[in-house]
C-alpha cells in the first residue's frame, strides 16, 4: 500500500484520499532546540527540557498546520485505557503548562471543530479515528499496556454510528524489533485475537511484538472493516534520523506529537 504519511518540515502529513477539513500528522525529531541529543524537536513538557524549547516548537508547528496553540488539547497519559470526550471548553489544556486536568487519559474524541487533539509518543502506537460524515475525530495512545488493555475497543464503545463510516489510521511506532518477556507474552495470549499473527518468539523470554498489527486486529475483531484501517510503514525504532525511540535510546530521548483536528 502506498505510504500516506508525507514528510514535511518538522512533521509527517497524512494524505487523505478525499478532500477533507481534517488535519492529521506526526512530528519528527529534526531541527529543534532540545538536547536529545542536540537540536531536536521535542514536544513533551514532562521530560527534562526547557519550557521555552517546547513552547517554541509548539509555535512552529501551530504556524505550519494552521491550528493556534490555544486550540490544542493535551492529556496526561498514563499507559491506561481511559477515554474522554473533549469539547471547546478543553481548549488549551496542558499546552502552556501541565496541570491535573485530563490526567490519566490515553484516548480522546470530539465532535467539535477547531480543536486539535494531541498526545506524545516515542515508540507507542498513535491510533487516529475519524469520520467526515459524522464530524468525529479521535486519538488513542497504545503502548503494550494500552494495547493489552484494548484501548482501541474502548474508543469504539464511544462511537454511536456505523463503523462503515469510521476510518482508522495507525501511525509511526516501534517495529516488531520491540521485544517482550514471557510474562507479557502470556498476557497477550489471553486476548481473543490470534497472537501468532503479531508475536514472534525468538527464544526463552524474548518475543518480538508488532503493536501496530495487534491494534489493527483488535479493531477488525470489533467490526471495523479492514479496508477502513490504514497502517503506516514508518517505524520509530528503525528510523532514528526521523524519530525518537524510548526503547532504543534507553529512555534518554524526546517525544513526538501526534495530532488530529477538524476545521
UniProtKB/Swiss-Prot annotation:
Domain of life where this protein originates: Bacteria
Disulfide bond sites: none
Pfam family, one: Cu-oxidase_4
Cited InterPro entries: Cu_polyphenol_OxRdtase, Cu_polyphenol_OxRdtase_sf, Cytotoxic_necrot_fac-like_cat
Gene3D superfamilies assigned to the protein according to its UniProt record, in alphabetical order: CNF1/YfiH-like putative cysteine hydrolases
Keywords: Copper, Hydrolase, Metal-binding, Oxidoreductase, Transferase, Zinc
Residues noted as binding Zn(2+) in the record, renumbered to the chain: 79, 124, 141
EC number, UniProt record: 2.4.2.1, 3.5.4.4, 2.4.2.28
Cofactor: Cu(2+); Zn(2+)
GO function terms (MF aspect): adenosine deaminase activity; copper ion binding; oxidoreductase activity; S-methyl-5-thioadenosine phosphorylase activity
Reaction equation(s) it catalyzes: adenosine + phosphate = alpha-D-ribose 1-phosphate + adenine; S-methyl-5'-thioadenosine + phosphate = 5-(methylsulfanyl)-alpha-D-ribose 1-phosphate + adenine; inosine + phosphate = alpha-D-ribose 1-phosphate + hypoxanthine; adenosine + H2O + H(+) = inosine + NH4(+)
Family note: Belongs to the purine nucleoside phosphorylase YfiH/LACC1 family.
Function: Purine nucleoside enzyme that catalyzes the phosphorolysis of adenosine and inosine nucleosides, yielding D-ribose 1-phosphate and the respective free bases, adenine and hypoxanthine. Also catalyzes the phosphorolysis of S-methyl-5'-thioadenosine into adenine and S-methyl-5-thio-alpha-D-ribose 1-phosphate. Also has adenosine deaminase activity.
Assembly and interaction partners: Homodimer.
Name this protein carries in UniProt: Purine nucleoside phosphorylase SERP0752
Organism this protein belongs to: Staphylococcus epidermidis (strain ATCC 35984 / DSM 28319 / BCRC 17069 / CCUG 31568 / BM 3577 / RP62A)
Amino acid at each position: 500500500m502506498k505510504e500516506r504519511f508525507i514528510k514535511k518540515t518538522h512533521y509527517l502529513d497524512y494524505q487523505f484520499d478525499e478532500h477533507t477539513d481534517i488535519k492529521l500528522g506526526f512530528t519528527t525529531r529534526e531541527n529543534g532546540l532540545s538536547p536529545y541529543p542536540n537540536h531536536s524537536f521535542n514536544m513533551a513538557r514532562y521530560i527534562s527540557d526547557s519550557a521555552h524549547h517546547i513552547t517554541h516548537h509548539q509555535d512552529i508547528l501551530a504556524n505550519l498546520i494552521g491550528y493556534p496553540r490555544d486550540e490544542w488539547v493535551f492529556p496526561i497519559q498514563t499507559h491506561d485505557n481511559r477515554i474522554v470526550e473533549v469539547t471547546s471548553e478543553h481548549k488549551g489544556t496542558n499546552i502552556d503548562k501541565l496541570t491535573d486536568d485530563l490526567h490519566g487519559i490515553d484516548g480522546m474524541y470530539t465532535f467539535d471543530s477547531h480543536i486539535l487533539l494531541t498526545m506524545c509518543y516515542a515508540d507507542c502506537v498513535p491510533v487516529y479515528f475519524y469520520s467526515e460524515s459524522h464530524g468525529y475525530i479521535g486519538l488513542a495512545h497504545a503502548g503494550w499496556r494500552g494495547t493489552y488493555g484494548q484501548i482501541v475497543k474502548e474508543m469504539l464503545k464511544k462511537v454511536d454510528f456505523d463503523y462503515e463510516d469510521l476510518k482508522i489510521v495507525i501511525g509511526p511506532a516501534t517495529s516488531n524489533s520491540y521485544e517482550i518477556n514471557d510474562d507479557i507474552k502470556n498476557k497477550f495470549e489471553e486476548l481473543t485475537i490470534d497472537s501468532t499473527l503479531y508475536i514472534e518468539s525468538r527464544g526463552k523470554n524474548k518475543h518480538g511484538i508488532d503493536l501496530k498489527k495487534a491494534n489493527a486486529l483488535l479493531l477488525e475483531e470489533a467490526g471495523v472493516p479492514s479496508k477502513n484501517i490504514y497502517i503506516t510503514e514508518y517505524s520509530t525504532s528503525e528510523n532514528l534520523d526521523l524519530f525518537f525511540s524510548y526503547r532504543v535510546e534507553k529512555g534518554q530521548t524526546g517525544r513526538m506529537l501526534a495530532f488530529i483536528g477538524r476545521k
